[in-house]
Amino acid sequence: MASKRALVILAKGAEEMETVIPVDVMRRAGIKVTVAGLAGKDPVQCSRDVVICPDASLEDAKKEGPYDVVVLPGGNLGAQNLSESAAVKEILKEQENRKGLIAAICAGPTALLAHEIGFGSKVTTHPLAKDKMMNGGHYTYSENRVEKDGLILTSRGPGTSFEFALAIVEALNGKEVAAQVKAPLVLKD
């Protein structure tokens, strides 16, 4: 069976942990992850001044699709940049239309709202993004640390990054693989 494939869209101002932890955990699970720079292949400055080098530009990564999951990290500026991107809208619409998984964390889910993705779904966000996410009544809000409703998977923030990543692994590769990946991470149960 071919490896599952993930596209992580990295925008300037993305939250570092919400980017790197899911990438690392998915790769541990054998998922082929492409970190795609929204503005190109140049290094991206994240919200806490950590610089991440994308694997590809979003334009090039899009040509290699489709992906089993599209992942949107949070960070206020990162989420704003994702929300304002026509390329992100196109990728999310294609992913939704082909019934592919879409995962977003922290402020990242606000890009779903901006691009009219997953309306009617139960979602969660960082507490400070809740009001923005609920504007217009297009979603049902959950206080869960990770919420999966059909093909929309959302999470709350940096402190839920491991749970978010493991939920993606479980959705793509099953509970057994997620448990195998989790065990050596020495996470608190």
From Swiss-Prot:
Disease tied to this protein: Parkinson disease 7: A neurodegenerative disorder characterized by resting tremor, postural tremor, bradykinesia, muscular rigidity, anxiety and psychotic episodes. PARK7 has onset before 40 years, slow progression and initial good response to levodopa. Some patients may show traits reminiscent of amyotrophic lateral sclerosis-parkinsonism/dementia complex (Guam disease).
Record's subcellular location: Cell membrane; Cytoplasm; Nucleus; Membrane raft
GO molecular function, one term: signaling receptor binding
The protein's role, per its UniProt record: Multifunctional protein with controversial molecular function which plays an important role in cell protection against oxidative stress and cell death acting as oxidative stress sensor and redox-sensitive chaperone and protease. It is involved in neuroprotective mechanisms like the stabilization of NFE2L2 and PINK1 proteins, male fertility as a positive regulator of androgen signaling pathway as well as cell growth and transformation through, for instance, the modulation of NF-kappa-B signaling pathway.
Result when mutating M26I: In PARK7; does not affect protein stability and degradation; does not interfere with homodimerization; decreased detoxification activity on methylglyocal-adducted CoA
Record PTM text: Sumoylated on Lys-130 by PIAS2 or PIAS4; which is enhanced after ultraviolet irradiation and essential for cell-growth promoting activity and transforming activity. Cys-106 is easily oxidized to sulfinic acid.
Gene label: PARK7
CDD domains: GATase1_DJ-1
Effect of L166P: In PARK7; strongly decreases enzymatic activity; reduces protein stability and leads to increased degradation; ubiquitinated by PRKN leading to its recognition by HDAC6 and targeting to aggresome where is degraded; interferes with homodimerization; abolishes interaction with PIAS2; reduced localization in lipid rafts; almost abolished detoxification activity on methylglyocal-adducted CoA
Name assigned to this protein: Parkinson disease protein 7
Effect of E64D: In PARK7; no apparent effect on protein stability; impaired mitochondrial morphology; no effect on detoxification activity on methylglyocal-adducted CoA
Covalently lipidated residues, kind S-palmitoyl cysteine: C46, C53, C106
Enzyme Commission no: 3.1.2.-, 3.5.1.-, 3.5.1.124
Sites of N6-succinyllysine modification: K182
Effect on the protein of changing C53S: No effect on mitochondrial translocation neither on deglycase activity
GO biological process, one term: detoxification of hydrogen peroxide
Subunit structure: Homodimer. Binds EFCAB6/DJBP and PIAS2. Part of a ternary complex containing PARK7, EFCAB6/DJBP and AR. Interacts (via N-terminus) with OTUD7B. Interacts with BBS1, HIPK1, CLCF1 and MTERF. Forms a complex with PINK1 and PRKN. Interacts (via C-terminus) with NCF1; the interaction is enhanced by LPS and modulates NCF1 phosphorylation and membrane translocation. Interacts with NENF.
Oxidoreductase found in the keyword field: no
